[in-house]
Amino acid sequence: MDAPARLLAPLLLLCAQQLRGTRAMNDIGDYVGSNLEISWLPNLDGLIAGYARNFRPGIGGPPVNVALALEVASIDHISEANMEYTMTVFLHQSWRDSRLSYNHTNETLGLDSRFVDKLWLPDTFIVNAKSAWFHDVTVENKLIRLQPDGVILYSIRITSTVACDMDLAKYPMDEQECMLDLESYGYSSEDIVYYWSESQEHIHGLDKLQLAQFTITSYRFTTELMNFKSAGQFPRLSLHFHLRRNRGVYIIQSYMPSVLLVAMSWVSFWISQAAVPARVSLGITTVLTMTTLMVSARSSLPRASAIKALDVYFWICYVFVFAALVEYAFAHFNADYRKKQKAKVKVSRPRAEMDVRNAIVLFSLSAAGVTQELAISRRQRRVPGNLMGSYRSVGVETGETKKEGAARSGGQGGIRARLRPIDADTIDIYARAVFPAAFAAVNVIYWAAYAM
């Protein structure tokens, strides 16, 4: 019994060592993502032992040089109302930490994202971000690679909503410049120095992006040193990218409907003046539709004090639509005024003819030798009062009455000639040519001022 017991003890010890080795292999497999030889692996526990992650590499010495690089995955949304855009990027940071160097091999070690919590990391943040979050499906989207000389590559995937100041004076024919500013939150230029990676000549993925409302025309990188009186100088890296708005969708949704509404208001110039309900309803409908179009277009824009190019065009169209309605009111007023004048002429013409006939009879009697007293007595007895006035006005005119009558007729005739109403049909004929020509001229000036 003693001999089997002595053999069983070493066997159990061997099994325990084998199990421990298997677990160690599994743990290493969590850190190494490839089929590599295990013999070259550094002793991670030895590297981490005594490692102070709260202090930067080389504390008390020269600053840490951190290289940054960006890859743009998508630009999801650009909002003019909130002056912001949403971007998903891969942020790559690289620096050297001599405390983690292992020079007995030339292999780069790929580590699990859980190892990140044991390392010192630059406190990089997005200066103009309104909100941001990391991705964690199916695991945390973080990458860490360790080179033998202690150089660390740290990559994370971030989605951030970033502020972008926009000048909308030429909207929707505007071009905007948005920025992504990266800076250290707590380390000044004495502790950390940022610079764009040498491989960052262009941004991978940005050239292939297809945006709904914009086209990315160009981008550039800048480096500057921000000076804060209370905290010192902080290095800042900025990505500037220029956006040109796609005008096609606005021409279809805003400009073409406005032009069609203006052209629709001109239809009233070909409708008869007698069709009052048709012309009035057409004019009011175009005015209200233009108002609705203006309100709906402004709903997606900020309430800014600047007048935008689209607002200018809407008001141009609104003035032409309203002017077409006013044109009909003016033409209808002239037509109604002419009708009243004709009615007055028809009523006064028979009365004037009767006065002339009575005056001729009285003049004939006077020429035949009838005495003035007899003529006066007969006129007083037989001739009505209006005939007396007519006779005096025709037959007994002195020089003064002629002069006064000529002066009155000359003054009133000149005013009436200047204020004589124009025929309504003539107004419509002029409007058919003047309105389209004026609208075309205004369009040429507008597009030359804003589009070129």
Swiss-Prot record:
**Single GO cellular component term:** postsynaptic membrane
Is Phosphoprotein there in the keyword field?
yes
Changing V370I has the effect of: Found in a patient with childhood onset epileptic encephalopathy; uncertain significance
Any transmembrane segments, and where? 252-271, 276-298, 309-331, 427-449
- List the catalysed reactions: chloride(in) = chloride(out)
Residue spans, topological domain Cytoplasmic: 272-275, 332-426
**Mind telling me which InterPro entries this protein's record contains?**
GABAA/Glycine_rcpt, GABAAd_rcpt, Neur_chan_lig-bd, Neur_chan_lig-bd_sf, Neur_channel, Neuro-gated_channel_TM_sf, Neuro_actylchol_rec, Neurotrans-gated_channel_TM
Location relative to the cell: Cell membrane
Consequence the record notes for mutating R220H: Reduced receptor current amplitudes
Question: Glycosylation: which residues?
Answer: N103, N106
Tell me the domain comment. GABAARs subunits share a common topological structure: a peptide sequence made up of a long extracellular N-terminal, four transmembrane domains, intracellular or cytoplasmic domain located between the third and the fourth transmembrane domains.
How it assembles, according to the record, is:
Heteropentamer, formed by a combination of alpha (GABRA1-6), beta (GABRB1-3), gamma (GABRG1-3), delta (GABRD), epsilon (GABRE), rho (GABRR1-3), pi (GABRP) and theta (GABRQ) chains, each subunit exhibiting distinct physiological and pharmacological properties.
Chain's role: Delta subunit of the heteropentameric ligand-gated chloride channel gated by gamma-aminobutyric acid (GABA), a major inhibitory neurotransmitter in the brain. GABA-gated chloride channels, also named GABA(A) receptors (GABAAR), consist of five subunits arranged around a central pore and contain GABA active binding site(s) located at the alpha and beta subunit interface(s). When activated by GABA, GABAARs selectively allow the flow of chloride anions across the cell membrane down their electrochemical gradient.
| Record's protein name | Gamma-aminobutyric acid receptor subunit delta
Organism in which the protein naturally occurs:
Homo sapiens
Which gene carries the instructions for this protein?
GABRD
